[in-house]
Amino acid sequence: MASSDKAFKLDIVTPQKLFFSGEVTSVIAPGLDGLFQIMKGHAPLLAALKSGKVRLSLSDKSEDSFQIEGGFFEVSGNKAILLTEDVS
């Protein structure tokens, strides 16, 4: 499937494994000061995360969500990496 013009690459990594790697159009994550949303073209960012729900809008227009146990979120160019202790 061709990636959307609005999509960007996201990797979600735990110490044990690569949990997710793919194209998304939006990520909503639990920052220390509240929820924040990342979309393609976002300014570079490094943010600490608290435990909570992460929501993904995938490039095929489906959605997914899961719980994380804190971590960090980095955006650079059109790539984002979410590092977390655990995902469920």
Swiss-Prot record:
InterPro entries: ATP_synth_F1_dsu/esu (IPR001469), ATP_synth_F1_dsu/esu_N (IPR020546), ATPsynth_dsu/esu_N (IPR036771). GO terms for molecular function: proton-transporting ATP synthase activity, rotational mechanism. It is found in: Cell inner membrane. CDD domains: F1-ATPase_delta. The keyword Transcription does not apply. The keyword Ubl conjugation does not apply. GO terms for cellular component: plasma membrane; proton-transporting ATP synthase complex. Keywords: ATP synthesis, Cell inner membrane, Cell membrane, CF(1), Hydrogen ion transport, Ion transport, Membrane, Transport. It is a peripheral membrane protein. It holds the Pfam family ATP-synt_DE_N. Produces ATP from ADP in the presence of a proton gradient across the membrane. NCBIfam families: ATP_synt_epsi. Belongs to the ATPase epsilon chain family. PANTHER family: ATP SYNTHASE DELTA/EPSILON CHAIN, ATP SYNTHASE EPSILON CHAIN, CHLOROPLASTIC. F-type ATPases have 2 components, CF(1) - the catalytic core - and CF(0) - the membrane proton channel. CF(1) has five subunits: alpha(3), beta(3), gamma(1), delta(1), epsilon(1). CF(0) has three main subunits: a, b and c. This is ATP synthase epsilon chain.
